């Protein structure tokens, strides 16, 4: 407790009015020493009470306004540790052995110090000595501080050794150890330290990998993994096993490890360079989190690596988990990182069972996928990797939603991929549907690319030209469709006479010559036509020679084109 003052003291009137005193004239305890938090003090009068009884007044300035900031000398006091039992608790048992020596030390030290500029009198020194012998709390506290400091000096360079259950928890809350410029070296150092202190516990850390694996396939994996953990496989690399176990100790689980940049790289290396059974262990550890990892910035790489190195049985397990919920699969496909995993899955599936699972998972979300920045690559991967029969579900949907897909930014790319990867009856149906909508598509910012791609594929001109007939002049004056008409002039020789004849019949032909887009159609017609058809076109152009200075007619009236 702090000293407040008593009636008759010369400085009692100067005390602050805002400091409430107890009934006995003393302040509540101001002692915040952490070492006395759980320490019960015996009921006795403290030094201030004794001084008051002797008629000695204390200067209250030491409580109201310290002259300078109080500092603790590190050489005299230690810091209490918070990890388990400290040296403070362990060394209290030796207090009785140096009790007398420390009491003498405290008294001698007080003799050499001034108390606010006044040296203690012999009577006061005797009182202080009695205080030390009567109240053991102050002595035990100082003794504990001294012993604790000595303990810290002895243990400061010793490595921290914790039981396994604490080590796992510390790893989860100490993720900051991987932040900074030297994360790789810290990780490797931790791996070596763990391997050196706890080599006998490697197999016990593999037990979390065995949970939630159902069916005959899961049972066989479980059996193999238990044998791996017990060291029954001669092919199991001890070094690789230690690496995996050490890293799991740091991160807490393989799932958390896969979400870290460094941890994911270590897992990929273990999967790629380790044994077949090590890949099984890692697969079992993440199989319940494969959907989550597929959409993780780092976790997606380990899932892709497992698709590359797994056997057909393991690959079937991963595919079945990813495709079990079509809604979740579509969500993965639309994700920036998940689309890579699904594309890798499509590229590696081989068996009929695996392909059937992929098709059943993707089919419900076809339209959403083709219109998405990430999802459209999944459909294109199917078209480029799977066979014609397996792509039937894609081509059927593309034919059905042809007009809707073709006018979409990403859908037009998918539709072009469908054209190039279709054969036979499927191709004929798709081409017929695109041709039927070609007049509308050729005027669209994205649909015109589909029509142009169809023309480049040497599709029969009859179906397209039927749609364009009587619309050539109109299409020639539009930004997007003018490219389609130019493509027809270049790729379909049989269409040239019909296109030129329709252009020449326009009442206001001079408007075509001055049009920002139609003038390019006229230039292309002059370049590709021959004979009577070209002669009629040149004669028509010469009638409007006065337009040769027009910015859009300069190229048309150039000697190179007209005299070609």
Swiss-Prot record:
Q: Where would I find the Pumilio repeats?
A: 249-284, 285-320, 321-359, 361-396, 397-432, 433-469, 470-501, 502-539
Domain of life where this protein originates: Eukaryota
Question: For this UniProt entry, what is the primary localization, expressed as one broad class?
Answer: cytoplasm
Task: Give the GO terms filed under biological process for this record.
Answer: negative regulation of seed dormancy process; regulation of translation
Signal peptide extent: none
InterPro entries in alphabetical order: ARM-like, ARM-type_fold, PUM-HD, Pumilio_RNA-bd, Pumilio_RNA-bd_rpt
Q: Where is the PUM-HD domain?
A: 222-564
Pfam families, sorted: PUF
Listed A to Z, the keywords are: Cytoplasm, Repeat, RNA-binding, Translation regulation
Q: Name where it's found.
A: Cytoplasm
- List cellular component terms (GO): cytoplasm
**A GO term, aspect molecular function:** RNA binding
UniProt entry tagged with the keyword Methyltransferase = no
The free-text domain remark for this protein reads:
The pumilio repeats mediate the association with RNA by packing together to form a right-handed superhelix that approximates a half donut. The number as well as the specific sequence of the repeats determine the specificity for target mRNAs.
PANTHER family, per database record: PUMILIO HOMOLOG 9-RELATED, RNA BINDING PROTEIN PUMILIO-RELATED
Q: What does this protein do?
A: Sequence-specific RNA-binding protein that regulates translation and mRNA stability by binding the 3'-UTR of target mRNAs.
| Name by which UniProt lists this protein | Pumilio homolog 9
Query: What is the organism of origin for this protein?
Result: Arabidopsis thaliana (Mouse-ear cress)
Gene name linked to the record: APUM9
